[in-house]
Amino acid sequence: MTNIAILGTASDVGKSIVATALCRIFSNAGVDVAPYKAQNMSNNSGVTPDGFEMGRAQIVQAQAARVAPHADMNPVLLKPNTDTGAQVVLQGKVCADKSAREYFGDTQRWAEAAFESLDRLMVRHELLVIEGAGSCAEMNLYQRDFVNFKTARRAGAAVILVADIDRGGVFAQVVGTLAVIPPEDRALVKGVIINRFRGDKSLFEGGVKMLESMTGVPVLGVIPYFRGFTIDAEDAVPLSSVVDPKQEPSGDKIGVAAIYFPHISNFTDLAPLERDPSVELHYLHRPKSLDGYKALILPGSKNVRGDLAWLETMGWRDEIEKFRKRGGIIVGLCGGYQMLGASIADPYGVEGAPGASAGLAMLPVETVLEREKALCNSVGKIAGTPFFVSGYEIHMGRTALEPGASPLLEVTERNGVATDDFDGAKSADGQVTGTYFHGFFDRPEVRTWFLRLLDGGYESPRGASVADPFELLAKHFSENLDLEKLFAIAGLSVKGEKES
């Protein structure tokens, strides 16, 4: 079999979605397939079953491929924590903090680790679906770019180039990319996928023929815009999200606000709320009156003290305090939980210069950032309720409750081992809560419990589709791709779908 590398003409052309779809398509055909991305830049990460950290996109792709996520699938993860720097997670563990100049000044170390992981995956699996990063034709960076064509060459992969027709200029995207890359890399490109087409596909049939004539590369498919599936975004709040709206939430919706920190992380925690038809979620960067909202969420942050200082400078503290006095519900997730406490100390300079900051003092807790990162898949029960939360913890902070403080969760399991512990905190009046659990809102019963705190008349959606979203995605792509050509590129014949 021949590995497949999904490379893009630019950032955000849909490489992650395409790779996810192909993982499920090949898995349905009975192939032992796994995802791989040499380097991710993202503050959206998760924890593998064996307790290592990797990007959320590759975790989702592993689920599509029906294999357990492994740190080798995303060996280099860059988690931006300043405007010019990032924490480097190497093969699932924190390695160092590097400025962009330091990191890109010598990529050999990172490339060696990435290829070591790639080699292991090629032994373990029949086929890899490799995702590139950004544009595969950034010529000023080409020699030190180990994520795109260098990875494809190492894996002996056939390259499929993805272009986004929705942003316009698709001919320039494809023809331009193929024109500027070296001939030896151009020879690896075996197909093109035109992504995010809107309207009548038949109107672009002439365009397909023109592209094939101009490049000599077959167009494997034109993929209509698909709204039935969302993969966790890597490095920015999705464009479909509502940010700093002028209007208040609709009167018939439950208004939820989330502060959009400069270094926001794991905002995918909010996706289940955003998808609920009864909820209107707004990301707020600029301070405004919160009178139209029932809840305020402080999400995760990759630079907690920096974002706390930003929050103070912007004037958010006054609005948050007024919201609490009005009876609003406030939830802090990971970094947001730390901000709600009395203080945050960073004695080792984990997230910047060593020092300490006063928190918002809405929860009776104090946090110290340690050198060692906690990485856990965890299960806990919301104290005083029958509801269990399954989530994951990724944090450098160790948070201590003051005497008499009440935890939010009774933790029963971490990384598959039974435990008797606690997590998070809640204020005496119950208005303010915080937790380290990412994925807190994932379970429908927990979401229902939370939303009924905001609106006693809330009813969870009825009659919603229970179809596997990966199957919906695979079906959508299968109907719009030339599977015979795709499978031939991978060295396979088209097989019947695997029964689920």
From Swiss-Prot:
| GO BP annotation list | cobalamin biosynthetic process
Q: Which molecular function terms from Gene Ontology are attached?
A: ABC-type vitamin B12 transporter activity; catalytic activity
Q: SUPFAM superfamilies annotated for this entry? A: Class I glutamine amidotransferase-like (SSF52317), P-loop containing nucleoside triphosphate hydrolases (SSF52540)
Record Pfam families: CbiA, GATase_3
Question: What PROSITE patterns does this protein's entry cite?
Answer: GATASE_COBBQ
Name its pathway.
Answer: Cofactor biosynthesis; adenosylcobalamin biosynthesis
Query: Keywords for this entry?
Result: Cobalamin biosynthesis, Glutamine amidotransferase
In this chain the GATase cobBQ-type domain maps to 253-446
Quote the catalytic residue positions: 334, 438
Question: What family does the entry list?
Answer: Belongs to the CobB/CobQ family. CobQ subfamily.
Check the record and name the NCBIfam families matching this protein: cobQ, PRK00784.1
Its biological function?
Answer: Catalyzes amidations at positions B, D, E, and G on adenosylcobyrinic A,C-diamide. NH(2) groups are provided by glutamine, and one molecule of ATP is hydrogenolyzed for each amidation.
Its name, as the record gives it, is: Cobyric acid synthase
Q: Which organism is it from?
A: Chlorobaculum tepidum (strain ATCC 49652 / DSM 12025 / NBRC 103806 / TLS)
